[in-house]
Amino acid sequence: MKMSRRAYAEMFGPTVGDRVRLADTELFIEVEQDLTTYGEEVKFGGGKVIRDGMGQSQLLADEVADTVITNALIVDWWGIVKADVGLKNGRIWKIGKAGNPDIQPDITIPLGAATEVIAGEGQILTAGGIDTHIHWICPQQVETALMSGVTTMVGGGTGPAAGTSATTVTPGPWHIGTMLQAIDDLPMNIGLLGKGNLSLPDPIREQIKAGVVGLKLHEDWGSTPAAIDNCLSVADEFDVQVAIHTDTLNESGFLEETLAAFKNRTIHTYHTEGAGGGHAPDILKAIGQANVLPSSTNPTRPYTINTIDEHLDMLMVCHHLDPAIAEDVAFAESRIRRETIAAEDILQDLGAIAMMSSDSQAMGRVGEVIIRTWQTAHKMKVQRGALQGDETSHDNSRVKRYIAKYTINPAITHGLSHEIGSVEEGKLADLVLWKPAFFGVKPSMIIKGGMIAAAPMGDINASIPTPQPVHYRPMFGAYPRGVHNTCITFLSQAAIDDGVAEKLKLKKLISPCKNTRQITKADMKHNTYCPVMDVHPETYEVRADGELLTCEPADVLPMAQRYFLF
């Protein structure tokens, strides 16, 4: 029996050679491989395959998947592949072909009475997003981020304090302990950052031992060369990452002094971008350093006709500045430069900036990391054409580059990639399903550690799940006992060895960060470009390897108003 491509795609989803448009963008992906078997596909429902004696075997629970996602199109840094995905004990068990091995050939994911089915036909499956620039200003950020497809948040803070509103820091053992307890019921993998702005090591050591997963150097606390050097030395001692927001005012040194203080040690440079902060106007030059792992934040993503006007007011609020003080206004204006914002678009597209993040409620939008990433990719496709390596028929290389920016690369940077960051066997089953028309905008399901944690849901009193009003709601995996079995609190190895989780009576899964100190830009997936950078001190023109980087602001974007009428 033969089926037309259209009929096959409508029944089982796209297969090799089929192309899929991502939302209303100009980005198209093409299926590279299909791990299912034609004629042996499994699908659940009335008159379908996954029934007793057919696609469902008689095997016991230990031998079968707890959950199978059938016929999903995986989009990840390593490929764009159609497959069944088996989950077991909260982890990605196997990626391959699901079914009944007693009667079907080449089965790698046995199904049985213990198996739940999630229908992935016609849907895209991605890893949960990772946002590594979180200001813990309010706990409600978690729900907003989760509903957008983010499943891991790394940052610092204690609530709407002035220090937290400006800097991603949870300072000192008492705050670290109380915050670790406070986040224990939140449906999100979380790691806290401590304060790294110190010239002596012991106050940093005690924070690492108290449970932070990394350290933050921020100019508002004084990002001096001495503090940078000391912080990186302690980070090397304990194998934790350091994130830095450099000195916008160039008070304690210029960019060259900051880079010298790094001493070729690995560091995650926040705001390596056009307007977010750091050495003005040339923080973008840090991109050319192999030891620098650069990220930018979503308020400038992508460059549009409204970007400049929006930023001045945001900056005054976030950094506790007074519009009546001329020096404060000058500080704000020094950080917002249309030339460097435009260059940021292109540097993201070239793979020179390796990561995307939010800067939640501190100029960035916590629920828009994923949207802004794909809007940037779309704008660059329209303005710059196909990436090298992409054919005219698809954008697979560009899509892999951009999805790595908020999944695997932040996981590698912060030492979390042994647990999360990709759709790979053995990792925590943090997965997001998307209908292609809503890709990057509105997920159809968020799976957290193998449990459904969030999904759009209709009227609870309706006879079926779909009647209006439909909106995102927490599911069983987002409630406390579900959270404790499916979400990770990341700690330093020193804190784990010191029994911090037991002392604080933490109930979430606990995992260490590791392998953070020897990585370089070369370890970033699809984002390894290390150009020689130049920023003109007066015109702010940006050049990478001698090429002038400039582009026009967008006056219209996809993934925007047409998706948010209600």
Curated annotation (Swiss-Prot):
Pathway: Nitrogen metabolism; urea degradation; CO(2) and NH(3) from urea (urease route): step 1/1
Chain's gene name: ureC
Signal peptide residue numbers: none
An annotated Gene Ontology molecular function: nickel cation binding
N6-carboxylysine PTM positions: 216
Organism of origin: Acinetobacter baylyi (strain ATCC 33305 / BD413 / ADP1)
Protein name from the UniProt record: Urease subunit alpha
Family: Belongs to the metallo-dependent hydrolases superfamily. Urease alpha subunit family.
Transmembrane spans: none
Reaction catalysed by this enzyme: urea + 2 H2O + H(+) = hydrogencarbonate + 2 NH4(+)
InterPro entries: Amidohydro-rel, Metal-dep_hydrolase_composite, Metal_Hydrolase, Urease_alpha_N_dom, Urease_alpha_subunit, Urease_AS, Urease_asu, Urease_asu_c
One Gene Ontology term, aspect cellular component: cytoplasm
The organism's taxonomic lineage, starting at the top: Bacteria, Pseudomonadati, Pseudomonadota, Gammaproteobacteria, Moraxellales
